[in-house]
UniProtKB/Swiss-Prot annotation:
Protein's UniProt name: DNA replication and repair protein RecF
NCBIfam families in the cross-refs: recf
Gene from which this protein is expressed: recF
Family of the protein in this entry: Belongs to the RecF family.
Gene3D superfamilies reported in the protein's UniProt record: P-loop containing nucleotide triphosphate hydrolases (3.40.50.300), RecF/RecN/SMC, N-terminal domain (1.20.1050.90)
Length: 367
């Protein structure tokens, strides 16, 4: 799968722009606030139906305009397709090959994408909800059943919480059964995902200090090393029953996958407390590379790999390592304030961005 071109209209600081992309590395450089990150954001919105910078897509509309329009052409299994998103104050419309996409479940996974940016610091120091979102987006791009289970789990959770707030307990058992069935699939999927990410991290994390980097998944539902969905379902059902009195007092559900979390660890110590800022950024880069390889292992296609502001927090040695890995990661977009310090082959493309004007800097080898 390759994205062939991207078109933007009334998006952020772009009144209108179009860019053709290389199937390999696309290196985009320019001063700050010129529109580099906006290109990655546009691809993210097209791929996932949401932004990584705002929860309100209308904030991305060009000043003075009433809408924005994004369109990409991409090739999948040798067949060209068009995907577009239109947003105005009334809502969002998404089309693939002129056919409407009515739900995000239909969209997510069509164009798998991995983003590495400064906002990923939340995976170390942010709230548990940030880390659950990371797993939810990753698994939703790979597993249609996970998307379905997640959607229906939150619906059932909302219904149960409504009953708890109004002290209506007569039908709670119905929702407990749904939560246990759906929640067990979510929990087991996350547990398995973290285990597989850890294997990939160990392959990627290579340093002279022999430090061990891994994800520690935290769930009250995991009671033993060898688990099954039935065992997790029974455990969640038991915990929902045991916490009923407390839940009635709180007016919400205190146990389940919506309370799960994970911690990035290095040598059995939390990265958040025992790593330098530069080391944290390097560790996150490894996690994001593992995320890309995880999607490849399930999709049999590399996701679009985006690295925003690559020089923020990474030294030249680590950047060189990332760029060395990039050709084996499929199509990649990188933004930076400077030109690369190492050679990029003719198969790649370098763009400069200045005041929302995109130009091809060179197709040639740069040293």
């Amino acid at each position: 799968m390759n994205i062939l071109s991207l078109r933007l209209k009334n998006f952020r600081n772009y009144k209108e722009a179009e860019v053709s992309l290389s199937p390999n590395i696309n290196y985009i450089f320019g001063e700050n606030a010129q529109g580099k990150t906006n290109l990655i954001e546009a691809l993210y919105v097209l791929s996932l139906g949401r932004s990584f910078r705002t929860s309100h897509l209308t904030e991305a509309i060009f000043f003075g305009s009433s809408y924005f329009f994004l369109e990409m052409t991409f090739e999948k299994d040798g067949v060209p397709h068009t995907l577009s998103t239109y947003v105005d104050k009334h809502g969002k419309k998404i089309f693939c090959d002129q056919s409407p996409i009515k739900t995000l479940s239909q969209l997510i996974g069509m164009i798998p994408i991995v983003l590495f940016s400064a906002k990923d610091r939340c995976l170390i120091a942010g709230a548990p909800s940030d880390r659950r979102l990371f797993l939810n987006l990753l698994l939703s791009q790979c597993d249609p059943q996970y998307k379905h289970s997640l959607s229906y789990y939150h619906r059932a959770l909302l219904q149960r919480n409504t009953l708890l707030k109004t002290k209506q307990t007569s039908t709670l058992s119905v929702w407990d059964e749904q939560l246990a069935t759906l929640g067990s699939y979510l929990c087991l999927s996350r547990y398995t995902c973290c285990a597989q990410l850890n294997q990939l991290i160990q392959t990627l994390w290579n340093n002279s200090l022999s430090e061990r980097l891994f994800i520690k998944f935290k769930s009250s539902l995991i009671k033993q090393c060898k688990i099954s969905q039935e065992a997790v379902k029974n455990e969640l059902h038991k915990q929902l029953t045991a916490s009923l009195h407390r839940d009635l007092e709180l007016g919400n559900t205190s146990v389940g996958p919506h309370r799960e979390d994970f911690t990035l660890m290095i040598n059995d110590l939390p990265v958040a407390q025992f790593s330098s800022e530069g080391q944290k950024h390097s560790l996150l880069a490894v996690l994001k590379l593992a995320e890309s390889l995880y999607i490849k292992s399930l999709h049999n296609v590399y996701p679009l790999f985006c690295m925003d502001d690559i020089h923020a927090g990474l030294d030249n040695q680590r950047i060189s390592q990332l760029l060395g890995l990039a050709p084996s990661l499929g199509q990649t977009l990188i933004t930076s304030t400077t030109l690369p310090h190492q050679t990029l082959s003719e198969a790649n493309r370098i763009f400069s961005v200045n005041q929302a004007q995109i130009s091809i800097h060179s197709h040639a080898i740069i040293k």
